[in-house]
Amino acid sequence: MSWSARQYTAFEDERTRPARDLLAAIPSAQVHSAIDIGCGPGNSTELLVERFPHATVRGLDSSSDMIEAARKRLPQVRFDVSNIDQWSETGPFDVIFANAVLQWLPDHASLLPALVDKLPPGGSLAIQMPDTLNQPSHRLMREVAAAGPWANKLSGAAGQRTEVASASDYYSVLRPHCSRVDIWLTTYHHPLAAGPSGIVEWFKGSGLRPFLEPLNERERETFLQAYLAGVEQAYPALEDGSVLLPFPRLFIVATR
């Protein structure tokens, strides 16, 4: 699946706020090395550079378009194109920062302990994942995909996202490997001045990508029209024409 840094950064302030909240929860320990896995266009990496000015900070992402944008943003930082599930470096890294990325990877029960293994004692694995699959925005993606002439073409699109497990499940996975595990859920309510069409633009940069990428231009246009019609029903505009987009996110800070 390809990614567009330009589309993703259309809502950069809103997408960066959870990264700030995640970073604020990392214990104030001495950090010599930090890596931003799934760094995107470098907005979250920039926060790590600010928080840990004396540390060696790096970023990696599977998208060359995202890495190109990150390198332009932070030319002093090393960025690598790499898939997290094939990332073989052993570290250790004092901080592994995974903001809005692990929901695209399977088998969290194996993945998370493997990431903790790359930490030294006292190091932190910081994770934030959108918990949105049961929100109207994402139910509508699946419904439109199943109902249209593209149903066969999109039969595997929904499966590209991993369902976020419960807090207790993640605690049980991480606690045997960690001295402390903090988990919390926050629902942001983002005001979007563009109304329902703003919701469509938001998810064109993330959740809609597996559904749009297999389609040709005409199919994509028709899909988005059907999706917008559903969004208009699920997220009615307020008096000023804007909408509030509820966006739940699960946070984990696991200290080895």
Q: Which role fits each region the language model picked out?
A:
Residues 3, 41-43, 158-256:
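Conserved Class I S-adenosyl-L-methionine
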Residues 95-109, 131:
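A short SAM/SAH-binding and catalytic strip from SAM-dependent methyltransferases
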Residues 105-106, 119-121:
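Helix-to-beta-strand junctions that scaffold the AdoMet/dcAdoMet cofactor pocket
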Residues 109, 116, 124-194:
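Conserved catalytic/acceptor-binding region of the Class I
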